Amino acid sequence: MFSNPGAFFLGTLVPSEQMFIKTVLESARVNGYNKIVEPCAGAFAMSHLAVQTGFAPQQIEASDVSMFTSIMGYAITGQSLEALELHADGFTDEELLNPAIALYAWKYLSMIKDAEKEYFYAHLIDMERRRDEHIAVLQQQLDRAKSILHGMSYRALDMWEHLEEVIDDPHALVIPNPPTYTAGFEKYYDT
């Protein structure tokens, strides 16, 4: 799994789902919608698709309550991770202010609980041996996402609170992406 850390940033939508959502986004844009709201942003798949269909990043609001997404969202929007108050065994608080290291720590520590399985143990060993390489790849992926989405807004915010804020905006297209679909990442929440 971690042999391709870039997979974190590709989203979980299959091509047919991406095409459908792109069609919806394109139609919304030409019909007067000027704001995309992505609660439960995950890996920001909807935000990426919105940019691909002509929305400016400044027209995108995203939110989530997961640590993975919040680290990414803060990195993309240039916010300090200090507000997240990250603490993790084996990492200094100062290290965890670096988004790539914070994502590495999140993944590494979430895999430890499955280390008795050979598959996960092998990945943990790889992560330890090639720590700097994994962090560098994560940084490249964060830089790529930032180059595409910089200008959007992100908050660590509950979906219901975000929906309440935008429910009466007639120009906002709300596309929540909760982790309840077949390819979802419910396991991200088991840490």
What is the predicted role of each segment?
Residues 1-191:
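Class I S-adenosyl-L-methionine-dependent methyltransferase catalytic core
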